């Protein structure tokens, strides 16, 4: 009986984690679609870009990733001549750099 309860709890936790990952991916895709609209460039590899963002910037919250993409599309990190995985990652890196600089000043 205890083993069964434990197994149910483990399965529930796995399912929750999978849902969180899917929600994170869906929100990043939505942000990238908005970025395409704002920059009027097409990003050809949405799935690969999402996966890279999740892997490389896992220390950031979804809110921070979305904020970085929004600032990037607004030109806060310079002009964009294309929309690529490299460009989006550059925006996020600049966001992290700015965030760390503000933290160090406090």
Regions found by a protein language model. Name each.
Residues 1-106:
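Charged interaction scaffolds used for protein-protein
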């Amino acid at each position: 009986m205890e083993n069964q309860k434990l197994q149910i709890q483990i399965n529930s936790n796995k399912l929750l984690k999978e849902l969180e990952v899917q929600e994170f991916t869906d929100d990043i895709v939505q942000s990238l679609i908005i970025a395409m609209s704002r920059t009027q460039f097409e990003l050809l590899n949405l799935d690969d870009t999402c996966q890279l963002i999740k892997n490389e910037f896992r220390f950031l919250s979804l809110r921070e990733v979305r904020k970085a993409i929004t600032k990037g599309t607004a030109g806060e990190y310079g002009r964009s001549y294309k929309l690529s995985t490299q460009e989006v990652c550059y925006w996020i890196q600049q966001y992290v750099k700015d965030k760390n600089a503000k933290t160090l000043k406090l």
